[in-house]
């Protein structure tokens, strides 16, 4: 007895025709050699071993009606084609591409469904609600789709999960093959009369291979023009059903409530490990556990409530200032503000009552926070650098804002201003009167010079000044 080698890829045959897939029931959709299978015919193996040349199908016949194809026509240029014909061809091409893409997605989903059916871990975790994979058929023009198979999930399971499970399952099969090969090779003629052979044969008999007894014909589900439901195959399995539970149950351990009570911990772990119990039993257990625990309403921790209390007066003030609860702890405010209404100011009484700070706290104002008065410092502006009551010396001429005034006129103004300052310093009454007259003349001349200068400037110069 010889074991077959692993299957290999067949030679791909490209068929160029207008039909997407020929409607033939005898088509072989397998891409690997199936010499190991019983239903594989000799024709299939021959076709897989001998590569064939691509077949090109050309539609159309001759004018005489014979089956011989016409000669290949030359490609016509699109210059003589109307715009309507071009739009029609583009629309047909777009529809053809959409149909091809849709059929490709259906084929991919079928393969994922086959993987989910073959892998025991995915087959047992059947989370789908109903229906199976009712893929669209040609009779309904492929208009109906199944809600269970969306872009990322196949019957409630993610495609990535199915791929990961398939890889791990293949690794498991490789491991089983290696172990069986080691057991078979270790059996020798010396063990025929002893008990070692019986133990090894018993190990083979005890190994359950029901997970591998899953019949599947790829030619059935890969024909997307026909409906195929993998749940029907699952129901046909002997001793299995659609809602088969997983052999490995998930163990959920609750955190122990009390470290000292070891009995409660053991009961909690015992009931959490047995996930097969009914929900009523689990509810009874949870009610018993909750009744044995102390409730915070009956045993409050009173020491925490009086942690920040120093005297009875402070407790009474806190109760009056905070109407939420008489047991509310009021922490000293670090950032007092009249807008936030602090409960207690961060300024101590020693600083307020000190004589050094009496001058700075003279303008203090009290703000009420509930029934407590809080003393805060009144905000005041700093002393001005320049005394507004002092008279400025108006005799000194200021620099003109307009840069268009000639420099000679500015020098004359400065000289006149210096002469006026000298007359003021002399202190005579006659010089004061002359100074006032000169000042009026200076203002008039300045206004005239400014107006003349503005009129003399061009528009571009004005724009540059404004900018």
From Swiss-Prot:
This entry carries the following GO cellular component terms, namely:
nucleus
Q: Which domain of life is it from?
A: Eukaryota
Q: What is its main location?
A: nucleus
Q: Which residues form the bHLH domain?
A: 92-173
Per the record, which residues fall in region Disordered? 43-83, 128-149, 245-275, 312-365, 390-439
Keyword annotations for this protein, in alphabetical order, are: Cell adhesion, Nucleus, Transcription, Transcription regulation
Q: What does this protein do?
A: Transcription factor required for yeast cell adherence to silicone substrate.
Q: What is this protein called?
A: Transcriptional regulator of yeast form adherence 6
């Amino acid at each position: 007895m010889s074991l077959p080698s692993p299957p290999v890829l067949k030679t791909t045959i490209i068929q160029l025709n207008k039909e997407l897939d020929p409607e033939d029931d005898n088509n072989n959709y397998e891409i690997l050699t199936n010499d190991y299978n019983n239903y594989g015919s000799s024709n299939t193996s021959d076709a897989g071993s001998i590569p064939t040349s691509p077949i090109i199908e050309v539609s159309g016949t001759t004018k005489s009606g014979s089956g011989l194809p016409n000669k290949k026509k030359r490609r016509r240029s699109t210059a003589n084609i109307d715009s309507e014909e071009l739009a029609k061809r583009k629309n047909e091409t777009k529809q053809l591409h959409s149909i091809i893409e849709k059929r490709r997605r259906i084929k991919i989903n079928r393969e994922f469904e086959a993987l989910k059916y073959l892998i025991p871990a995915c087959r047992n975790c059947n989370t789908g609600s109903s229906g199976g994979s009712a893929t669209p058929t040609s009779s309904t023009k492929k208009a109906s789709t199944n809600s269970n198979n969306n872009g990322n999930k196949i019957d409630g399971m993610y495609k990535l999960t199915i791929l990961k499970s398939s890889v791990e399952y293949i690794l498991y099969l490789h491991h089983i093959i290696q172990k069986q090969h080691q057991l078979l090779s270790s059996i020798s003629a010396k063990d025929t009369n002893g008990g070692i052979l019986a133990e090894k044969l018993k190990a083979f008999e005890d190994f359950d291979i029901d997970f591998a007894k899953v019949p599947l014909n790829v030619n059935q589900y890969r024909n997307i023009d026909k409906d195929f439901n993998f749940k029907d195959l699952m129901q046909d399995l002997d001793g299995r059903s659609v809602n088969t539970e997983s052999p490995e149950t998930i163990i959920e351990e609750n955190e122990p409530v009390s470290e000292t009570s070891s009995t409660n911990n053991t009961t909690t772990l015992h009931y959490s490990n047995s996930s097969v119990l009914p929900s009523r039993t689990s509810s009874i257990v949870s009610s018993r556990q909750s009744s044995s625990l102390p409730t915070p309403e009956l045993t409050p921790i009173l020491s925490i409530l009086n942690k920040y209390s120093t005297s009875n007066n402070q407790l009474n003030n806190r109760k009056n200032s905070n109407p939420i609860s008489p047991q509310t702890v009021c922490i000293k405010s670090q950032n007092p503000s009249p807008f936030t209404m602090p409960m207690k100011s961060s300024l101590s009484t020693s600083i307020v009552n000190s004589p050094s700070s009496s001058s700075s706290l003279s303008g203090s104002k009290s703000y009420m926070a509930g029934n407590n008065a809080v003393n805060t410092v009144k905000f005041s502006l700093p002393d001005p650098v320049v005394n507004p009551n002092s008279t400025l010396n108006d005799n000194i001429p200021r620099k003109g804002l307009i840069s268009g005034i000639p420099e000679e006129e500015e020098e004359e103004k400065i000289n006149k201003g210096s002469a006026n300052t000298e007359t003021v310093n002399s202190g005579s009454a006659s010089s004061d009167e002359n100074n006032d007259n000169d000042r009026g003349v200076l203002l008039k001349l300045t206004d005239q010079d400014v107006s003349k200068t503005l009129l003399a400037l061009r528009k571009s110069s004005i724009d540059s000044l404004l900018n």
